Amino acid sequence: MAKFRASNILGDPFALATVSISILAWLIACIASIISDIKTDYPNYSWWAVAYMFCCIMGVTIVFGSDTGLVYGVAVVGYLSTGLVLTTLAVNSLVYADESSSQAAAAGFILMSMVIVVWIFYFGSSPQATHRGFIDSFALNKESSGAYGNRPMSTAYGPRPDTMSTSAPQMYTSAQLNGFETSSPVSGYPGGGPGSENRSSSQARFGNPSASNVAGNNSGQDEVPPPTEYPYKAKAIYSYDANPEDANEISFSKHEILEVSDVSGRWWQARKSNGETGIAPSNYLILL
């Protein structure tokens, strides 16, 4: 697991605010529950809600501090969903009590429930969600995710196939391929199949294609230009360093605006403001 850093919480306004409010709400509920238990018959069920929420708050604090929300997000949502049920039932058993201490405990549970709803909405959303990208944009250390280093999510997609090269394929015209046609549609050999009488004359059919190939390669009309339309715009929610072994990838910094031509795959064809083009992982970007 990644190392816990207090700066990940102090530098993230969302994490700092929600963790602080949850701790304050838990202290209110816990202290009020102790006082209520002394004065009246306090429901034992609510003590389990207090203990369970203590573990949940500590767990979420560790996730924020280690910046591993993308790794443990599903588990966090599951535990918080159970905590929301417990705090809601605790509120129902305390809010109608006559003692002010019981009502104060119910207020603490209500405040915790509100924070839980916000956390579930945050951790339950994908990194590409607009609201999550907006929240993460205020964090100072969010781009250097502790669980993944400088490239937090690139390993999630596995190896990228080599067929996604951005270079235009070499195209040939019928004039360039003159002499390469097969005269026998069955055998696929010029001049007929192996052993045919016309087999010996097949070399004459090829002629000297090297000259025509050179001329064809030099003519601009035979080349297919790379895509020039980039109808989408995306904002980088993390910094990304391109793999030095792959010339097709591009590097970009957090909050940088990129132009994107295709958003159907996991790797998007993008163009930077300086005109540099290449592919970028889609889970680092959010569409604008």
Curated annotation (Swiss-Prot):
Region ranges (Disordered): 183-230
Pfam families, sorted: SH3_1
Polar residues biased stretches: 197-221
Extracellular side: 36-44, 92-103
Membrane-spanning segments: 15-35, 45-65, 71-91, 104-124
One BP annotation, GO: regulation of actin filament polymerization
Lineage top rank: taxon: Eukaryota
Residues of the SH3 domain: 229-288
Keywords linked to the UniProt accession: Cell membrane, Glycoprotein, Membrane, SH3 domain, Stress response, Transmembrane, Transmembrane helix
Main location per the UniProt record: membrane
Cellular localisation: Cell membrane
GO cellular component: plasma membrane
InterPro entries linked: SH3-like_dom_sf, SH3_domain, Sho1_SH3
Residues in compartment: Cytoplasmic: 1-14, 66-70, 125-288
Topology class, membrane: Multi-pass membrane protein
Glycosylation sites: 44
Family statement: Belongs to the SHO1 family.
Reported function: Plasma membrane osmosensor that activates the high osmolarity glycerol (HOG) MAPK signaling pathway in response to high osmolarity. Regulates radial hyphal growth and germination. Involved in virulence and mediates resistance to oxidative stress.
Assembly description: Forms homooligomers.
Stated name of the protein: High osmolarity signaling protein sho1
Species name: Aspergillus fumigatus (strain ATCC MYA-4609 / CBS 101355 / FGSC A1100 / Af293) (Neosartorya fumigata)
Gene that this polypeptide is encoded by: sho1
